Amino acid sequence: MVKYPSGSLAAFRKPINKKENEIRHTYTHRKGVNFSDRGMTLEQQINESNKYYLNEEIAVVHKKPTPIQIVKVDYPKRSKAVIREAYFRQASTTDYNGVYKGYYLDFEAKETRNKTNFPLKNFHEHQIFHLSACLKQKGFCFTIIRFASLERYFVTPASFVINAWREKDKSSMTLKEIEDNSYEIKSGFRPTLPYLKAVDNFIADREREL
């Protein structure tokens, strides 16, 4: 069974005027129109969602900057430095982190054009180690997986990803496995990708275990 997050973000939304409501109605009901159709990558969808969450004071989540190795710097003036040569270094942790309802969030964003499975080689050892460390500190850790060809999105708990990655001779997670162990979310408008609905379910699951 695919787990669909329950609940609504309506309680968080500010009152909207008639004109804004008409715009939203037109946008959401026009056939085939959404941000995915406009060619947004998963990263762009998450970034847009994070802006919405921040502006609405729902959550504070940011993308971690990619570290850069500076190789050559010129100083044409004493007060000015010009970087002439630099290289992107491999990120040492994950893509995003932040706080929501007092809980620490840490997660990866991954997408594939495969239709039946997600390759585990897309996860690196340092990412698995980092997610494991955050889980030990009771953080909420997960991966947002997009099957681009299917336009399907899943919020998959890090614990499931870690176990699959560590399993000997396992090269991928099947779509069925992801369906059975994740919360599926739908792309939309305000926010573009409502992944916090899945986090609400993670929080509820933990509270039931206490």
Curated annotation (Swiss-Prot):
Pfam families, alphabetized: RecU (PF03838)
Keywords noted in UniProt: Cytoplasm, DNA damage, DNA recombination, DNA repair, Endonuclease, Hydrolase, Magnesium, Metal-binding, Nuclease
GO terms under cellular component: cytoplasm
UniProt cross-references to Gene3D superfamilies, sorted A to Z: 3.40.1350.10
An annotated GO BP: DNA repair
Annotated TM spans: none
Top-level division of the source organism's lineage: Bacteria
Family the UniProt entry places it in: Belongs to the RecU family.
Entry protein name: Holliday junction resolvase RecU
Organism: Lactobacillus helveticus (strain DPC 4571)
Taxonomic classification: Bacteria, Bacillati, Bacillota, Bacilli, Lactobacillales
